[in-house]
């Protein structure tokens, strides 16, 4: 079973927000996964869809059957955190953490039933 993957790195969205979405597409065919993501209203859905389309393009480069691909796994890891400050009362400042994510999509060919 041949596998192909694609990674989208340094995306400006928190990994916790993206992880909620990816559980809905794991194990589905690529076509069903894309349809599911297309109708989600979240910002992260568009980012995962872009990574999924990139993985499909990588599969085409490897001459794999695109119609028989299944989403084997989707990993969402935390990237570097951007630290910013917001002015507060009495001359103080509080830290704002702007989190980033790395999304890895792994596709595999569907196992043929004998």
From Swiss-Prot:
GO terms for cellular component: cytosolic large ribosomal subunit. The keyword Phosphoprotein does not apply. One of its GO terms (biological process) is translation. Keywords: Ribonucleoprotein, Ribosomal protein, RNA-binding, rRNA-binding. The keyword Ribosomal protein applies. GO terms for molecular function: rRNA binding; structural constituent of ribosome. This protein binds specifically to 23S rRNA; its binding is stimulated by other ribosomal proteins, e.g. L4, L17, and L20. It is important during the early stages of 50S assembly. It makes multiple contacts with different domains of the 23S rRNA in the assembled 50S subunit and ribosome. The globular domain of the protein is located near the polypeptide exit tunnel on the outside of the subunit, while an extended beta-hairpin is found that lines the wall of the exit tunnel in the center of the 70S ribosome. Part of the 50S ribosomal subunit. Belongs to the universal ribosomal protein uL22 family. PANTHER family: CHLOROPLAST 50S RIBOSOMAL PROTEIN L22-RELATED, LARGE RIBOSOMAL SUBUNIT PROTEIN UL22M. This is Large ribosomal subunit protein uL22. It comes from Desulfosudis oleivorans (strain DSM 6200 / JCM 39069 / Hxd3) (Desulfococcus oleovorans). The gene is rplV.
């Amino acid at each position: 079973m041949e596998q192909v993957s694609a990674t989208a790195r340094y995306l400006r969205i928190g990994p916790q927000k993206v992880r909620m979405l990816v559980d809905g597409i794991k194990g589905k065919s690529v076509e069903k996964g894309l349809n599911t993501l297309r109708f989600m209203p979240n910002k992260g859905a568009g980012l995962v869809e872009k990574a999924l389309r990139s993985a499909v393009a990588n599969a085409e480069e490897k001459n794999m059957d695109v119609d028989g691909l299944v989403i084997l796994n989707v990993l969402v890891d935390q990237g570097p955190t951007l630290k910013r400050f917001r002015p507060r009362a009495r001359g103080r400042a509080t830290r704002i953490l702007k989190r980033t994510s790395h999304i890895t999509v792994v596709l595999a060919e569907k196992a043929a039933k004998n």
